[in-house]
A protein has these predicted regions:
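Positively charged n-region of N-terminal signal peptides that target proteins for export
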Residues: 1-4, 18-19
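Short, low-complexity S/T/E/D/G/P-rich linear segments that nucleate or cap local secondary structure
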Residues: 6-8
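Generic alpha-helical secondary structure signal
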Residues: 10-11, 35, 47, 316
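C-terminal motif of bacterial Sec signal peptides marking the signal peptidase cleavage site
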Residues: 13-16
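A composition-driven surface/loop motif
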Residues: 18-287
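C-terminal outer-membrane/trafficking sorting elements
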Residues: 285-321
Length: 321
């Protein structure tokens, strides 16, 4: 009898430790006849409410523990349904957004202030294309915590797939545990303003490649690299793997006592004349620079500076016309 009782106690203990969403409840949902495939989530302190388009109600399951929202997207979402969009707004000092799916999606941020003391503020477990739409003229702030009460995480905003940041708003990110922004695959930035204000590790950490087309990225308060670009699945032969490219926009990186480099890419780096990369890093023997643009290149990569349609090496040698 004692052995049976001990076994039951252990089982209950293990179950409660493993399932952090055991006490989650369904989020109050208002359905709308709109057919735009949207889910609207409004955070308000320790609670959250949802508005869901009627045509996709059978394709999303929304639960929460307080303001910690968990969205599970049906595996049946695909070409016939179209992608589902999520728009987050409101404020919570103890909340988060978790989304799990297997088809491309868009997550919009509209005047959102979200802090998770025990994990990432936004956690997207979707290996497809995920667009982060920062809504026009809005300021959004994400902050994670320092507690390891849950499984370790890699970024205040983290994504399993490839992330495309777009929009004409502002996103502020405080990474108090690891990186501020982390993506398992590639990352692109267009039009928006991203301010990384703190990162225990890298300001931005992604794999495959990083491309800046337009907009502004400001990085400060990081403990290691400003931007780190790794390989895709450690495949050194994959196209564009580990590359850093700027075709436009502005990136400002302040070392803030960091031990890393401004840009640490495992592949080639290219900065066009229409783009600006500013850093106050002190150049070291392992770095190359162009006008103070300090970068680190590994895996026999190279830095290309493009001016007026011509490509140069950092020391000014013309490669092609």
């Amino acid at each position: 009898m004692k052995n049976i009782l001990f076994f039951l106690i252990v089982c209950i203990s293990l179950t409660s430790c493993k399932d952090s969403h055991a006490n989650s409840v369904e989020v109050p949902v208002t359905y709308t006849n709109d057919t735009t495939n949207m889910v609207y989530l409004t955070y308000s302190g320790t609670s959250v409410s949802a508005v869901v388009c009627e045509n996709i109600k059978n394709y999303v399951t929304i639960t929460s523990t307080g303001s910690h929202v968990r969205v599970i997207q049906s595996p049946n979402v695909g070409l016939s349904t179209g992608e589902i969009g999520y728009e987050l707004t409101g404020t919570s000092e103890n909340g988060s957004f978790y989304m799990e799916g297997a088809y491309k999606s868009t997550v919009g941020l509209r005047a959102l202030t979200l802090t998770n003391p025990n994990g990432p503020a936004i956690d997207i477990q979707n290996g497809k294309r995920v667009e982060i739409s920062i809504k026009r003229d809005t300021e959004n702030t994400l902050t994670d915590g320092t507690s390891t009460a849950v499984d370790a995480w890699k970024g205040c905003l983290q994504c399993k797939g490839h992330v495309e940041f777009k929009g004409y708003g502002t996103l502020n990110v405080y990474g108090n545990y690891a990186n501020a922004i982390w993506s398992k695959e590639y990352m692109t930035v267009r039009n928006c303003t991203i301010n990384v204000l703190k990162a225990v590790k890298d300001g931005i950490n992604c794999n495959q490649y990083f491309t800046m087309e337009s907009g502004v990225v400001n990085i400060s308060g990081q403990g290691d690299d400003g931007i780190s670009v790794g390989l895709k699945n450690n495949d050194t032969s994959a196209e564009n793997t580990g590359s850093f490219t700027m075709t436009g926009g502005t990136i400002n990186i302040n070392p803030s006592g960091a031990s890393g480099t401004a840009v640490n890419a495992l592949g080639n780096q290219s900065v066009a004349s229409s783009a600006t990369l500013n850093t106050s890093w002190t150049q070291s023997a392992s770095n190359v620079s162009d006008g103070g643009k300090s970068v680190k290149v590994l895996r026999e990569g190279q830095v290309l500076i493009i001016r007026n349609g011509r490509t140069y090496t950092p020391n000014g040698n013309l490669i092609n016309n």
